[in-house]
Design a protein with these regions (language model features):
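Short acidic donor-binding/metal-coordinating loop in glycosyltransferase active sites
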Residues: 21-23, 245, 317
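N-terminal propeptides
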Residues: 283-345
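Catalytic domains of cell-wall/extracellular-matrix polysaccharide-remodeling enzymes
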Residues: 97-100, 107, 122-267, 272, ...
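Glycine- and aromatic-rich loop/turn segments at beta-sheet edges
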Residues: 1-3, 277, 311-313
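Structured helix-beta-strand junction loops
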Residues: 51, 111-112, 188, 269, ...
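Active-site beta->alpha N-cap acidic-glycine motif
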Residues: 1-168, 265, 281-290
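Conserved alpha-helical elements of sugar-nucleotide-dependent glycosyltransferases
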Residues: 36-43, 258, 295, 322, ...
Length: 345
């Protein structure tokens, strides 16, 4: 059992999904720019508004502290920086993140969208040698929590908004000292924002021309979703869909064009698009138990203060409880978290 649960989907029979948008907000235009210089985040918000959809924006604070650095190779994982990430791009940090985009943050909140914590500086929580072997990373639990707290406090003090979820940069979970992202989110009181369906658009596809590459990337956003729904109209029920609020690794923005097609497709199958917060509050906070379960409301109330759910967000009501799980159920949250941290240290 775990206080922090990885949220990828919820249990429901209704056609509803959530969409998350990572790495913004971004005050640079789409690439290629076919919208008169309008900021990418504005374009996404315009499209969501057109389809009466709500999004979950997984934002960064400011990457301008991530220097000295140099750009990597276009089309590769380190395209925006060898040592660190830079959003929306290296040497363009002043056009991205919460710190530099007050207007966009206020628009996101005013229009009813959710904001979640993707790290103030978007620094890796720990090592990821096979993809980001040259990347700097945090060394231990305390600097990870400090970085998350920095963005959390900024949203609270500037906008009166309290974030309740976070997603680790590049899904790197291991933290030096024997900790994981779950320990960091335990400290923050967060849930772990994951996803069950990749909306694509972040991975570049290379063809002879920019336009051919862009069209292939848009197709990669739309066609897998189309095939899934044609095979089973309920295939995406209750799922969280991953999206990008920024450039892909070749500095294109297929999301500026493909999001509209995705929303049209979902709407044609009768899907609503809501925030992750709404998905959990209005349908179910659990992956395996829905409102039809006897005692559902009691389980919902209990999970707010006790660790009754496993880290994969499943209750597993038919499984026998172990002594360790019983101890966690009975222990006050702060005490249990404190004991775990002290034991590892």
């Amino acid at each position: 059992m775990s206080y922090t649960r990885r949220i990828e989907r919820v249990h429901t029979k209704e056609r509803v999904v959530a969409m998350t948008f990572d790495d913004g907000p971004m005050d640079l235009p789409s690439s290629p720019d076919k919208f008169g210089g309008r900021a990418l985040t504005d374009l996404l918000l315009d499209t969501l508004q057109e389809y009466h959809a709500l999004g979950t924006f997984d934002v960064v604070g400011d990457t301008s502290e991530n220097y000295p650095d140099m750009a990597g190779k276009s089309g590769q994982a380190d395209w925006g920086g060898v040592r660190y990430d830079h959003y929306p791009d290296i040497n363009q940090d002043g056009r991205g993140g919460v710190v530099h985009n007050d207007r966009l943050v206020r628009r996101i909140l005013h229009e009813g969208h959710q904001i979640t914590n993707h790290g103030y500086r978007h620094v890796l929580f720990g090592k990821k040698p096979f993809v980001y072997g040259k990347r700097d990373h945090f060394h231990g639990l305390d600097p990870v929590v400090a970085d998350l707290t920095r963005l959390h406090t900024l949203l609270q003090e500037t906008y009166g908004y309290t974030m309740t979820m976070g997603r680790p940069p590049h899904y790197v979970d291991k933290i030096e000292g024997g900790f994981t992202s779950y320990d960091a989110y335990d400290q923050m009181g967060y849930l772990y924002l994951a996803a069950a369906f990749d909306g694509a658009g972040w991975l570049p596809i290379h063809h002879n021309t920019v336009q051919e590459s862009l069209q292939a990337e848009i197709a990669a956003m739309v066609e897998p979703m189309k095939r899934a729904l044609e095979a089973d109209p309920d295939a995406l029920v209750g799922q969280i869909i991953f999206q990008k609020d920024g450039y892909n690794m070749s500095r294109r923005t297929p999301v500026a064009f493909g999001l509209k097609q995705q929303l049209e497709l979902l709407q044609s199958y009768g899907y609503r698009v809501v925030t992750v917060e709404q998905l959990m509050a209005d349908y179910s906070p659990f992956a395996d138990v829905g409102r039809e379960e006897p005692g559902f409301e009691k389980l919902v109330a209990l999970q707010k203060t006790r660790g009754i759910v496993f880290s994969d967000n499943r209750l597993r009501l038919d499984d026998p409880m172990t002594w360790g799980e019983l101890a966690m159920l009975l222990a006050p949250r702060a005490e249990a978290i404190g004991r775990r941290v002290a034991k590892i240290r």
